[in-house]
Amino acid sequence: MNTIYPVIWSNNKVLLIDQTSLPSRYTLVEISRYEDMAKAIKTMIVRGAPAIGVAAAYGMYLGARDIQTQDRETFLKHLDKIAQILRQTRPTAVNLFWAISRMLKTAYETLGTVEEIKKILLETAQKIQEEDLQTCQAIGHNSLSILPTNPEKLTILTHCNAGALATAGYGTALGVIRSVWTAGRLNRVFADETRPRLQGAKLTAWECVQEKIPVTVISDNMAAHCMQKGLIDMVVVGADRIAANGDTANKIGTYGLAVIAKMHQVPFYVAAPLSTVDFSLETGDLIPIEERDPSELYQIGNTVIYPDGVDYYNPAFDVTPADLITGIITEQKTVNPKELITLKG
């Protein structure tokens, strides 16, 4: 198995796989300032809720490292400002806010000198990264107990990229697929291309190719046809934020996929760590939905493909109601969305 780590701590700086360059070029971007990390998150050089959380944690440390004061209160005030800048990068991904809050909590609760706080912050960022990798592996393992018994080898449809590139490594939805592949139960992956940024075609397909997992890319509007023809045995997607009732925000197009799966009685699972669950939100109606630049819709490379005078609407996410979700696969266990609240720590 080829190991893919989108966020790497090396020689006192962060290396990010530039996901905007894949699959044509594999490029590492060096990040040594928190401002550059904020830009990398905003421009989706690093993307996927868990990976964003890991990147933000390192961003907090990079910012803390550069604060030039030995006064604890002054240091913490500067750190609060850094946190606010990082929070503004991607509003839907709850792991971003979770990781930043954890880093701030660590700083405020650490007694000692400013230099000691900085040291603990680096250790905390590394711990967040290590924990996420272990969590993804646990999600993959837990999925094996809920697989349909027939057929023996399953064809799984996924949307966007919830793989190693979207996490600390291994992946959530693609982590499930990796585990099913390793267990000998996978026939093939169907990857929605995932308009407008094509994360399925570019990133999920790339990850599968790296590990020689059979993958077929389809356009988003082919999913219904594939289910109608009996080509899909189950659907597994990731999540950017899950409300307490199980409503799930994920890449735009996920909701439609869930409706189609319900129509054709295809099991529809969400794979996500508990850090993606926002228990403070009762329902998905309260999840903020990021809207991105319309150029993602009308431009391919430097070429504008639609006529002048057209208006655009480009939400990055939609919310799938809990009653369309068969189960949520977490690092603890798989639960019915209505039972998600029982896993609250």
Swiss-Prot record:
Classification via InterPro entries: IF-2B-related (IPR000649), IF-M1Pi (IPR005251), IF_2B-like_C (IPR042529), Initiation_fac_2B_a/b/d (IPR011559), M1Pi_N (IPR027363), NagB/RpiA_transferase-like (IPR037171)
Keyword Isomerase found: yes
Gene Ontology BP, a term: L-methionine salvage from methylthioadenosine
Sections of the chain in a coiled coil: none
Isomerase recorded as keyword: yes
NCBIfam families for the chain: eIF-2B_rel (TIGR00524), PRK05720.1 (NF004326), salvage_mtnA (TIGR00512)
The protein, known as: Methylthioribose-1-phosphate isomerase
Organism expressing this protein natively: Crocosphaera subtropica (strain ATCC 51142 / BH68)
Gene (name only): mtnA
